[in-house]
Amino acid sequence: MRAGLLEGVIKEKGGVPVYPSYLAGEWGGSGQEIEVKSPIDLATIAKVISPSREEVERTLDVLFKRGRWSARDMPGTERLAVLRKAADIIERNLDVFAEVLVMNAGKPKSAAVGEVKAAVDRLRLAELDLKKIGGDYIPGDWTYDTLETEGLVRREPLGVVAAITPFNYPLFDAVNKITYSFIYGNAVVVKPSISDPLPAAMAVKALLDAGFPPDAIALLNLPGKEAEKIVADDRVAAVSFTGSTEVGERVVKVGGVKQYVMELGGGDPAIVLEDADLDLAADKIARGIYSYAGQRCDAIKLVLAERPVYGKLVEEVAKRLSSLRVGDPRDPTVDVGPLISPSAVDEMMAAIEDAVEKGGRVLAGGRRLGPTYVQPTLVEAPADRVKDMVLYKREVFAPVASAVEVKDLDQAIELANGRPYGLDAAVFGRDVVKIRRAVRLLEVGAIYINDMPRHGIGYYPFGGRKKSGVFREGIGYAVEAVTAYKTIVFNYKGKGVWKYE
């Protein structure tokens, strides 16, 4: 892989590039060296240096004592200019960023390029976040207690925000969390996934080159357990976390009383009504299952089709999944690349076996093709047994979904709402009355009509209910989690309260 922006920052050791952490002012780290393996062939492609406990302490101290003020005191127009310049830098280096995403995250080239472009767009649209920063004026005329007073309500940055990012969008998620934290005047400490931390390092370098205050950002390459010290630290006022529900619950337990954006487990249901365009539904559902090998929180995991169209629908979805080419993502003809690790394939195969043992039938795929490669899979599940299956009860982060024939919309809604997650749902059909009923009753954060769920750059807000998280991400919507209200009350009663000159 090319060093790109990090040339001069990366050192080589035994022919392997070594990426440092960024410690709120300097690149470095004296902790352990952690191997970074490519999911393509499990070869070591880099190492990252984690900071020592003392370096973490010093970094948080810099962010808290200086960095949060550097970010807050920088005029909003200058913050916006920094983010726009960073977008230009990333865009100029698109090929290098995409190459790293292919090698480190195992994304097919087209998906990697798409993620880089999404990061660029997110940075350029930061000005839309500013539309949500306004406050309120409250006259005190309406209660005896507040007569001759008035109040102003304003939003202020919290200080230091911890951005904990997942492996599936290692560039975009880092850029997104940094963007909305910084545009509102916060300093940011980024803890990337240790599976693919390289894109986040490149993003931080682009931001620094664009003029980001050097003491207002940090990148700490820490394994999960060691990262708890960031979350638990009282100098960190908010945590923006994307990852599994289990880890998210641990983050809240360790972090205690502070503000959180939690984008957690998902896996979405897709409901197909009897009057749906079946070609459209099959196309969207298949793509929702296999895109980035199903390693997306908004991937389709449960297909619920009304009885008159069920047979044709699952036949078409199975046909599309069976036609996909699985393999090395560096090959432009490949549709589906590897899962992030062999253990992810193990989990998928165990879930398929569990489904078959409980009455399920594999309609497409179902075979392991290598340590990290697997066929996209559709499993037919009886309506009266599906709730017992791992595929229903848990989010299996892989290209696999179960399909259930339902007698009507109400049964579909009941099965969709029965899962512990509530991120998104898709509904395919033409009957406006039925669609409106689904919109009202589905317990999810977003509903996509005649489309697959896809959060994209967050142009529309996203986030879930139940075990899928709290608060929302998306342009302008994370303001709730990374700022605080401050109320200022003016008293005009009595003589000598105000001096007029």
From Swiss-Prot:
Residues that hold NADP(+) according to the record: T165, K191, P192, S193, I194, G224, E228, S244, G265, E395
Annotated alpha-D-glucose 1-phosphate binding sites: R72, R79, R154, R155
Positions that bind AMP: R72, R79, G134, R154, R155
EC annotation from Swiss-Prot or TrEMBL: 1.2.1.90
Chain residues that bind D-glyceraldehyde 3-phosphate: N168, R296, C297, D298, H455, G456
Reactions performed catalytically: D-glyceraldehyde 3-phosphate + NADP(+) + H2O = (2R)-3-phosphoglycerate + NADPH + 2 H(+); D-glyceraldehyde 3-phosphate + NAD(+) + H2O = (2R)-3-phosphoglycerate + NADH + 2 H(+)
Keyword Oxidoreductase: yes
SUPFAM superfamilies with a match to the protein in the record: ALDH-like (SSF53720)
A Pfam family annotated for this UniProt entry: Aldedh
Record keywords: Allosteric enzyme, NAD, NADP, Nucleotide-binding, Oxidoreductase
Temperature notes for this entry: Optimum temperature is 96 degrees Celsius. High thermostability.
rRNA processing recorded as keyword: no
GO molecular function: glyceraldehyde-3-phosphate dehydrogenase (NAD+) (non-phosphorylating) activity; glyceraldehyde-3-phosphate dehydrogenase (NADP+) (non-phosphorylating) activity; lactaldehyde dehydrogenase (NAD+) activity; NAD binding; NADP binding
Binding-site positions, beta-D-fructose 6-phosphate: R72, R79, Y184
Regulation: Allosterically activated by AMP, ADP, glucose 1-phosphate (G1P), and fructose 6-phosphate (F6P).
Residue numbers annotated as active site: E263, C297
NCBIfam families, per the entry: G3PDH_Arch
Subunit field text: Homotetramer. Dimer of dimers.
Job description of the protein: Catalyzes the irreversible NAD(P)-dependent non-phosphorylating oxidation of glyceraldehyde-3-phosphate (GAP) to 3-phosphoglycerate (3PG). It is highly specific for D-GAP.
Family membership noted in the UniProt record: Belongs to the aldehyde dehydrogenase family.
Protein's name in the database: NAD(P)-dependent glyceraldehyde-3-phosphate dehydrogenase
